[in-house]
UniProtKB/Swiss-Prot annotation:
Family: Belongs to the phosphoglycerate mutase family. BPG-dependent PGAM subfamily.
Enzyme Commission number(s): 5.4.2.11
Subunit structure: Homodimer.
Protein name: 2,3-bisphosphoglycerate-dependent phosphoglycerate mutase
Protein role: Catalyzes the interconversion of 2-phosphoglycerate and 3-phosphoglycerate.
Database matches in Gene3D superfamilies: Phosphoglycerate mutase-like (3.40.50.1240)
GO molecular function (one): phosphoglycerate mutase activity
Cross-referenced HAMAP family: PGAM_GpmA
Superkingdom per UniProt: Bacteria
Reaction(s) catalysed (UniProt annotation): (2R)-2-phosphoglycerate = (2R)-3-phosphoglycerate
Organism of provenance: Klebsiella pneumoniae subsp. pneumoniae (strain ATCC 700721 / MGH 78578)
Amino acid sequence: MAVTKLVLVRHGESQWNNENRFTGWYDVDLSEKGVSEAKAAGKLLKAEGFSFDFAYTSVLKRAIHTLWNVLDELDQAWLPVEKSWKLNERHYGALQGLNKAETAEKYGDEQVKQWRRGFAVTPPELTKDDERYPGHDPRYAKLTDAELPTTESLALTIDRVVPYWNETILPRLKSGERVIIAAHGNSLRALVKYLDNMGEDEILELNIPTGVPLVYEFDENFKPIKHYYLGNAEEIAAKAAAVANQGKAK
């Protein structure tokens, strides 16, 4: 049976991950640790014999720079890359820039968990005159007002990620190309929910660690057979637990 592999990588730790702040579409860069995580992901992929024909990422530098570091370790810096806003992190609305633990102290752990992980729950909206509104950013100049979010739930994130998967990424896999996607915690959760047909309760508890390659294997009908992380299982579990705890009061 022919097996097709897809590699997903959540960006390495960002400066705002390190400061435990809601990031969303705010364009922060990787922290020093995040750069190291991205390089380590590349080394793991190289050790396992992976190479690629095409890469996808978002238009946010923490994902772009993660991909650069991964490809550099693979000696594939030349690889063609498509960047799309549809792979951006979920837009966190008026929460963007706020400290997660301080927000939990103000609103309660459960409310923040729902904002972070609830399937159809949207954080408080930005107004369009807010400097954080993506309509003020030149990289989104060609998008319509209807496409530009003022806040997003995971359900709304799925509404942009899944069509992009089906219309753009999946056809490339079906053509036989080897693909890597470097994206974000929630855009990847959106894709994982779709691929694994996960329920809303299941996705609430799913946390994707930073900078760890997640490999999906598909059968000849492009149905997922299995998926697994590359690396030390205990370390990966600890990183996923740390992601889950970010939204709790101190």
